């Protein structure tokens, strides 16, 4: 089975933008705990700093290890949260989200077009959602629901979803008509992982759920 890239490799375009039209926030250059907003620039928050909300329109956002921020938001760009970072929420439209080890997100994590990967020891207090992308959780906890429409879902090494897993069907009629040869999505849950709520399937899904995994009721709406 092909593995989704880990957070350290998921958002490489963000790292490449450092120094190339990227706004670098450092303690020596800027006052801490202020909101940071840009339009056509990526944003890099140095390790251990505390800032307010962070937003851009066309650019990625990267928080280094142990950085703290409020709401993190971009439209066209990826988000990378380094180990032990803390944020209120993380949201993008066109871009992936990579979450390192022992990160705490007090709210939700969401993207429309992009993968989401969460490393060991991290906690997302509310929902995690993508429409066109895969979700990978490794020994991490989701306090709300997990939802995708067009991407595989993988729970490994003791990952826990406190709410429901929802695999929606948001394909248009054109895609449904001509997708006869497309492979079904995959839902993988290993023996150490758990889903406290229900699993709702609104489209064909290939299930790889270990018999030892703790999961709730499986409901097929197809």
What positions do the PLM features span?
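Intrinsically disordered, low-complexity terminal regions
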Residues: 1-222
């Amino acid at each position: 089975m092909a593995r989704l890239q880990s957070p350290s490799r998921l958002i490489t375009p963000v790292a490449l933008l450092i120094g190339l039209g990227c706004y670098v926030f450092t303690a020596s250059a800027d006052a801490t705990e202020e909101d940071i907003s840009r339009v056509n620039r990526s944003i890099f928050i140095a390790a251990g700093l505390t800032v307010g909300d962070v937003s851009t329109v066309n650019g990625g956002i990267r928080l280094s290890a142990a950085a703290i921020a409020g709401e993190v938001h971009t439209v066209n760009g990826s988000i990378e949260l380094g180990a032990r970072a803390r944020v209120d929420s993380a949201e993008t439209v066109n871009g992936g989200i990579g979450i390192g080890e022992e990160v705490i997100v007090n709210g939700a994590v969401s993207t429309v077009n992009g993968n989401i990967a969460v490393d060991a020891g991290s906690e997302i207090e509310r929902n995690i959602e993508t429409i066109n992308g895969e979700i990978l959780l490794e020994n991490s906890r989701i306090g709300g629901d997990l939802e995708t429409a067009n991407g595989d879902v993988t729970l490994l090494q003791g990952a826990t979803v406190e709410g429901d897993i929802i695999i929606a069907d948001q394909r248009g009629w054109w895609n449904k008509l001509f997708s006869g040869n497309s492979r079904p999505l995959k839902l993988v849950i290993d023996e150490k992982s758990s889903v406290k709520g229900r699993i709702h399937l609104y489209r064909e899904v290939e299930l790889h759920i270990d018999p030892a995994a703790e999961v709730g009721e499986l409901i097929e709406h197809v």
